[in-house]
Amino acid sequence: MSVKWEKQEGNEGVLTVEVDADTFKTALDDAFKKVVKQVSIPGFRKGKVPRGLFEQRFGVEALYQDALDILLPVEYPKAVEEAGIEPVDRPEIDVEKIEKGESLIFTAKVTVKPEVKLGDYKGLGIEKDDTAVTDEDVQNELKALQERQAELVVKEEGAVENGDTVVLDFEGFVDGEAFEGGKAENYSLEVGSGSFIPGFEEQLTGLEAGAEKDVEVTFPEEYHAEELAGKPAVFKVKIHEIKAKELPELNDEFAKDIDEEVETLAELTEKTKKRLEEAKENEADAKLREELVLKASENAEADVPQAMIDTELDRMLKEFEQRLQMQGMNLELYTQFSGQDENALKEQMKEDAAKRVKSNLTLEAIAQAENLEVTDEEVEAELTKMAEAYNMPVENIKQAIGSTDAMKEDLKVRKAIDFLVENR
């Protein structure tokens, strides 16, 4: 095999590959063995047609495509390795010369990973946020725990207040006409939750059980139902019942109900403080790492290929789908509800995708510049951590992953971020 790499404009180039005649002959032989199984010629059983007769009847050209299908998946990666390039998308392959008894020549137009010119990435001067937890933070968290344990109690008298839950009937009208999805009976709504159209919930405050009211609102311009977006509407509302939150008393009994590992409110308070400190520490660490990576990336120069952005967009969309599934939704339902199709979602994600790709390229370049390497022991430690997380034997994890090359790259990128933190 002979390989020639010609760099063109931007990150594109052409790989010219010549495969020797013997290798091409072997591919033609294998192609014939495959094709002949499907060929019937009078006087011969299927699969038993002689090669000479086959080529006489159909021409050797009938084997070329199958030979290429056998050859290219093997020879193209070899050529890429020999040329020392890193393609980031599928190649556009053209066959320049194909003839029995001769060498095969093909070209592959590819987009390769760009070179990164690093700017400043040490001494960036970014400080970690303060992680101190105040008594007020702890009290607010305990109050939130109280809120989550609150019971709804029917108000025998009095009007709707912010935070109350009302049971109501409503029917909406636009231009005097009822619209689909605008009617409900005995609907429970927490006033102040922001669940309804802006302005709706505020107009319920001050009403008493049994009250009826015309609530006038305007649908937001970006409302998911286009036929309603930006239009004024009137909702005829009837209040059946008002429920107020009744908070449990903040005492030792409350503490034991919340956490069976504590006996007193003082213990719960201390445990809550430690949990908040840990959460703040993790949040500050994550923010610091993110800001350092972003700054180093902004200081670097790289012509990011669209192919890499498109790949990242696809990955981000899959991540988004997985999050939706965890919430009991899917992408189709989401697009119906939000009024956005897949292309609109990708358009929203495009800027973040480009930043992610450039950040990753920058971190790879930093790892190379600082000679950061990942040892076999570090890979084993990561595999062990995964095995513990999934409660599986390490060998099963290894079989599922196959090659650890991607894991090594991820660990190397992580080391580059650690380097930024240590040298900020």
Swiss-Prot record:
Primary residence: cytoplasm
EC number, as in UniProt: 5.2.1.8
Places the protein is found: Cytoplasm
GO molecular function: peptidyl-prolyl cis-trans isomerase activity; protein folding chaperone; ribosome binding
All copies of domain PPIase FKBP-type, residue ranges: 163-248
A single Gene Ontology CC term: cytoplasm
Record's keyword terms, sorted: Cell cycle, Cell division, Chaperone, Cytoplasm, Isomerase, Rotamase
Pfam family, any one: FKBP_C
Top-level lineage group: Bacteria
Catalytic activity: [protein]-peptidylproline (omega=180) = [protein]-peptidylproline (omega=0)
PROSITE patterns the record matches: FKBP_PPIASE
GO biological process entries: 'de novo' cotranslational protein folding; cell division; chaperone-mediated protein folding; protein transport; protein unfolding
Domain notes: Consists of 3 domains; the N-terminus binds the ribosome, the middle domain has PPIase activity, while the C-terminus has intrinsic chaperone activity on its own.
Entry's family note: Belongs to the FKBP-type PPIase family. Tig subfamily.
Function: Involved in protein export. Acts as a chaperone by maintaining the newly synthesized protein in an open conformation. Functions as a peptidyl-prolyl cis-trans isomerase.
NCBIfam families recorded: tig
Protein name: Trigger factor
Native organism: Bacillus velezensis (strain DSM 23117 / BGSC 10A6 / LMG 26770 / FZB42) (Bacillus amyloliquefaciens subsp. plantarum)
Lineage, top ranks: Bacteria, Bacillati, Bacillota, Bacilli, Bacillales
